[in-house]
Amino acid sequence: MRADLSTIQQTLTPEAAAALARAMDEAGRRRHGQTTPLHVAAALLAAPAGLLRQACARAASAAGVGGGGGAAAGAGAGAHPLHCRALELCFSVALDRLPAAAAAAAAAHGAGASPPVSNALVAALKRAQAQQRRGCPEAAQQPLLAVKVELEQLVLSILDDPSVSRVMREASFSSAAVKSIIEQSLSAPSPCPSAAASTTTAGPGPLSPSPSPLPRAGAANAYLNPRLAAAAAVASGGGGGGGDDARKVIDVMLKPTRRNPVLVGDAGPDAVLKEAIRRIPTAGFPALAGAKVLPLEAELAKLAGDKAAMAARIGDLGAVVERLLGEHGGVVLDLGDLKWLVDGPAAAASEGGKAAVAEMGRLLRRFGRAGVWAVCTAACTTYLRCKVYHPGMEAEWDLHAVPIARGGAPIAAAAAGSALRPGGSGILNSSMGMLSPALRPMPVTPTALRWPPPGSDQSPAAKPAMCLLCKGSYERELAKLEAEQTDKPASRPEAAKPGLPHWLQLSNDQNKAKEQELKLKRSKDELERKWRETCARIHSACPMAPALSVPLATFTPRPPVEPKLGVARGAAVPTLKMNPSWEKPSVAPTLELRKSPPASPVKTDLVLCRLDPGTNPAVENEQKESCEGLTALQKAKIAGISDIESFKRLLKGLTEKVSWQSDAASAIAAVVIQCRSGSGKRRNVGTRGDMWLLFVGPDQAGKRKMVNALSELMANTRPVVVNFGGDSRLGRVGNDGPNMGFWGKTALDRVTEAVRQNPFSVIVLEGIDQVDVVVHGKIKRAMETGRLPDSRGREVSLGNVIFVLTTNWVPEELKGSNVETLLRGEERMLESTSSSWQLELSIGDKQVKHRADWLCDDVRPAKLAKELSSSHGLSLDLNLAVGALDDTEGSHNSSDVSVEQEQEKGQLAVKRSTPAPGSDILELVDDAIVFRPVDFTPFRKTVTDCISAKFESVMGSSSSFRIDEDAVDWMVGSVWLTDEKIEDWAEKVLKPSIERLWHNVKHDSGRSIIRLTAVAAKALPRWGGGREGLPVAVTIAIDGM
């Protein structure tokens, strides 16, 4: 097979050989076992001005004229780019379905070799060669290897392949019609290639593809069906009004069906729509005379974040439209740019968005025949997203797409021109217009569009300067990087052997050298960017972008331990790092900074003292409010965040759900906003939309709640959880429960299915440290390439998915005496909460209990002291020393403060001896977040205070009660594991039970006490559902009640 390929390559012109080479590269990139005609067709279609793309555009244009009437005939001269885009997506899906090469076959062919050519492709190439010989009588007398196959014959032969025809039918294209158009373009007499042109020194063929439209031939063709022939005749006759886009809009509105125009284009649709609306009163058509234009874009854009409210507002438009119809006889709904419908990361696919589309469809169906029209505009990418997320929108809204190009030129010429220009903004110039990869994720925030791409040239003044220390470190790493690159064998290509012809020499040495140069340049840019950001973050001598308009003098002085794993690229051991700037903080005042003139060099010093009395109080209060809840180290970390408002909103939402892990919430918010703005870690392939976070440490409930909050805030949906071996005692989140559709599928199949269903979701991979070697390798490659294969080898692009990898691994240096106690308490809390238990109210003899050992002096209940000194009073028995005993004598600090005091003098090195996740995973994730052990003391105090308040509100201060230790433990565990509020439960469940008991028993004179205990019994249904929640009722253990 390889010998056949080398022979056939000699018979191809340079253009055809280049197309075949691109197809083989695509097959190799996708790790396919063979190069098929599908790869060649995809490579031919990817060229913006290629022959196949132009022919497909002409075929789509001819097919659409027949249903468009005379008004649309003028527009038929250039097909809409979305037609070819749909064909590209179909080819991409077909390539994704092809199986990947087996490991043994890949090793046999070699790492750098291209996949072999399939039998179907060899047959297509031989058909093209035979057709080339038959088409030129002079070529029939030449040797077989002397006949050079032109690109046109290669395209025609590829279109004859059954697999290519099937894919084109899926995209509503006819391969016979496309082939007929190409043959018509070749029907004009042209000189046959001479023998001299077929030598090895021949230049490009005379029939190279041209971006100009293909000429139409008047001769009939057997491949062209009568409908397409009639459509081509109408198009060749030319319909009037093709050059006036505003006239096209009015003509569409006068049609009996598909009468609501949507103007699609990357430049000019808004101006065309305004011109059409201006012409409506003076158009001279009775149907449009006196129609009232109702602008809705501004109102709908305000509701873009709340699709449910948008659907309700559209439903309320019925009364307004009915009133305007009675007054004016006609209404034109100006919907404006449709980006309000698909704006946001997950808004396009939400139920609210579908409801908005359905409500607008019902409104137009109700009044459509009575004189109501809808007009709107959309960019090409926006319209494509509308068609993807709302496939039935065109039919429900009765839309008719009107392509708009710059300057009124045909849309095909405008799209091709913008694709050929370096800065073109046409749809063919976007990243989604190429097949490698087939479908790149779209940016979801305007900030991502404004961020300069990696490797872009910037002026030295625009880049932050580095101090001498960081510059020296940067130069040392740069020299080491260049030395490693020089030592690689690929950087020293062998000299070509002059005795062999060019087609037998190694042709990939130059390509490898260019790839190495590009990779080295990207590595240098990334290294420089890393050191500039590091210097700007930890050294105050370098100014940063004014993301925070707050002087560092107002920052909180106490530095906490950074709650994330800072993995240095190329370091042998990943470490938990502290900011070195906290070792010797500066104490210089900032008065000189504020009084320095603008032209003087600015130096920001960290000040650990209060502002001078002369500071403006209003400015100081405003700064304190903006920095409330953030520590000094966190402010230093987020100093480079461009979208500070989004960071604050995300941090607030995460902290409200998991208040005891505020440091982890701050680190998560910072890395998410940085990645969404384009400054995340680039894993060898440039900036991508997917994100990888690693949650390490204990507190499984905190991780689960953090993931829930992150998914609701970023994707407006529940997270998808795939368990690779996590703790089964915790209730599942997201949709990880039993599902009939998941039977027979592996865990990776579930991940790929979730990505296909929603490319903007949050996916949790629990127990990532327990996966096998195969799954570990696939996840690692997904981090590097942005594509994840399923069990059948079909790859899926990761889109804008946020992946959260969780593990219970705890760094060795966090395992101190106090931390070990907290970990044991968390384990016991999980075991007790997962068991069957019930709360019970009873009356017993009053006994003086010793004070709970876990209570500190400052939180000892006053009512307990009252009971010890008098027979009447409030008795609170809380013997809860087991879960949170502080082994440090005289220490009553929380876990965070204790850990900080133990770790302030050095770094927390993560040793390889611990069962840590793989070092490759640590180096590839965007960030690794450390969750600290949970200190349940604040939880217990909150629960006991709330329960005490309910008892006292019913019984008053003259009676005694006691809460059992196990009861408090179980209630604390339920509050920790669920989202339930203890205050709501105590008011609606516990208080009625206390009132019932108190009003139905005799009140003894202080000799009896009411007790709230936890008993092991068959558990009642839980408050709010689940199995870890608080009980829906509290039983009363008294006879007759």
Swiss-Prot record:
| Compositional bias per record (Polar residues), positions renumbered to this chain | 891-900
Domain Clp R, which positions? 8-188
Gene3D superfamilies registered for this protein in UniProt: Clp, N-terminal domain (1.10.1780.10), P-loop containing nucleotide triphosphate hydrolases (3.40.50.300)
Q: Where is this region: Repeat 1?
A: 12-98
Q: Highest taxon of the source?
A: Eukaryota
| Reported function | May act downstream of MAX2 to negatively regulate karrikins/strigolactone responses. Acts probably specifically in the karrikin pathway. May function in a transcriptional corepressor complex.
Protein name per Swiss-Prot or TrEMBL:
Protein SMAX1-like
Q: Organism, per UniProt?
A: Oryza sativa subsp. japonica (Rice)
> Gene for this protein?
SMAX1L
